[in-house]
Amino acid sequence: MAKRILFREEARKALEQGINQLADAIKVTIGPKGRNVVLEKKFGAPQIVNDGVTIAKEIELADPLENTGAQLMREVASKTNDVAGDGTTTATILAQSMVREGLKNISAGANPVALRRGIEKTTAYLVEQIAAHAKPVEGRKTIAEVATISAGNDSEVGEMIAKAMDAVGRDGVITVEESKSLETELDVVEGMQFDRGYISPYFVTDSERMVAEYENAYLLITSNKISSLQDLVPILERVAREGRPLLVIAEDVEGEALATLVVNRLRGVLNAVAVKAPAFGDRRKAMLEDIAILTGGQLISEDVGIKLDKVTLDMMGVARKITVTKDKTTIVTDGSTKAAVEKRVAQIRKQLETTDSEYDREKLQERIAKLAGGVAVIKVGAATETELKDRKLRIEDALNATRAAVEEGIVPGGGATLLHLSKGIPAFKAKLNAEEQVGAEIVYRALQAPLFQIAHNAGLEGSVVVEKVLEKEMPFGFDALTGTYVDMFAQGIVDPAKVVRSALQNAASIAGMYLTTEAIVVEKPEPKPAAGSAPKGMM
């Protein structure tokens, strides 16, 4: 395939057009008065969303040059979403502003490499400042406030997430499911989560969220490595006859065995997903036994004289629901094994009392928390399928934001933190050389963009709102819902520090890469062959 190569100004301009198209579609969603975006679906009803990363994933531009720019911007959103679970729209707005300002300076003759260094140094300074201004999350009220803001000012969601954290603890497992009713409700069930994901991405059932989800599944729990097809076939046949999904937890699944599971899953013969067993050595065996007890199954191991090909259905565990992502597996059970779980927890507590090792103590406490903590399930209800999907996305965002807040603390929300921190840039800039100072200036201007857009979406003049907030000190900001200038902490308008930090770092990273781009190589569209003339009819 022939390639098309563009250089310097022309290359950057083409990328910028793609960046702007994607950013303009996303930035209308920011703030309490942000608008929705409708996504056309090839099959089924269109999806109405208010979530930056979901919109970014849907956008594919016809022009390959512009599409390359859009993909760069998509990277900002998805990277921020992966790290912090929220703040994707803020990251996109910051990146677009840095790119626009940077391009102006490069056109005027600035050195792109020095600009990038200036942007990186200023961002590192701001990250330190964000950490310095962050307040630790204390009490249920703050958790509810963080969740409410992230869910688009839905206080019912905020209250529910605070309740869920009360039920299972701050480090507990909280999952979001679709409800059959109109109501959104909270349920605390028996279950466990461990840090291992699917072995192959071909196991996913939802390619948008990259997760494998099944209900009423069998679990094959083994400490062996599975590579031979002969070992696996009898089990697969038994499970397939039942018409239920299968989760395989093993030391490893490879070769013919893995290929068979993937092929059966893709052909729809048997819904299966394989994950590696958590932990290592003796601790791995103990955790597999915990999972077996929780799900009412048996640990299949040659140590206890059970071979894989002799496994029957009553030796397998059962889960009400399983959710597997690329790095986590969540198992939710129906509570029928409660007595056995309590017995197991008591046994681990006895071990805890007799151990002298600090490391062993920590790991035993971790096992108790996993077994006894349970899983809080938020069941999302709505009147229509479209509303249900939007509400579920908002709740997942709010949950991620709340976890991020617990981790690194909170800062004033609504774009106020970034704006107030920009006041320190002129003094910091003095430490940089003349060329790097231009990079610092680019970041300075970009920090005004999120609040400008929040005000703009609320139907106000962004630059006026920015000026008024700059006149006041941290933690004052603009409440776009009421149109007033308030103390953001007192009003409960807060953002997790981790979300603000990740948004800024990812925006600066992509902007720096873009500004130092000197050439772009894309595929050249092949000319379509001219249509042949129609055959002449018979006389």
UniProtKB/Swiss-Prot annotation:
Quaternary structure and interacting proteins, as annotated: Forms a cylinder of 14 subunits composed of two heptameric rings stacked back-to-back. Interacts with the co-chaperonin GroES.
GO biological process terms held by the UniProt record: protein refolding
Family: Belongs to the chaperonin (HSP60) family.
Pfam family, one: Cpn60_TCP1
Gene name for this UniProt entry: groEL2
Keyword Cell inner membrane recorded: no
SUPFAM superfamilies according to UniProt: GroEL apical domain-like, GroEL equatorial domain-like
Role this protein plays: Together with its co-chaperonin GroES, plays an essential role in assisting protein folding. The GroEL-GroES system forms a nano-cage that allows encapsulation of the non-native substrate proteins and provides a physical environment optimized to promote and accelerate protein folding.
An example Gene Ontology molecular-function term: unfolded protein binding
InterPro entries per the UniProt record, alphabetical: Chaperonin_Cpn60_CS (IPR018370), Cpn60/GroEL (IPR001844), Cpn60/GroEL/TCP-1 (IPR002423), GroEL-like_apical_dom_sf (IPR027409), GROEL-like_equatorial_sf (IPR027413), TCP-1-like_intermed_sf (IPR027410)
List of residues binding ATP: 29-32, 86-90, 414, 479-481, 495
Keyword tRNA-binding: no
One cellular component term from this protein's GO annotations in UniProt: cytoplasm
Cellular localization per UniProt: Cytoplasm
Name of this chain's protein: Chaperonin GroEL 2
Organism: Synechococcus sp. (strain JA-2-3B'a(2-13)) (Cyanobacteria bacterium Yellowstone B-Prime)
EC number: 5.6.1.7
Keyword field: ATP-binding, Chaperone, Cytoplasm, Isomerase, Nucleotide-binding
Catalytic activity, as annotated: ATP + H2O + a folded polypeptide = ADP + phosphate + an unfolded polypeptide
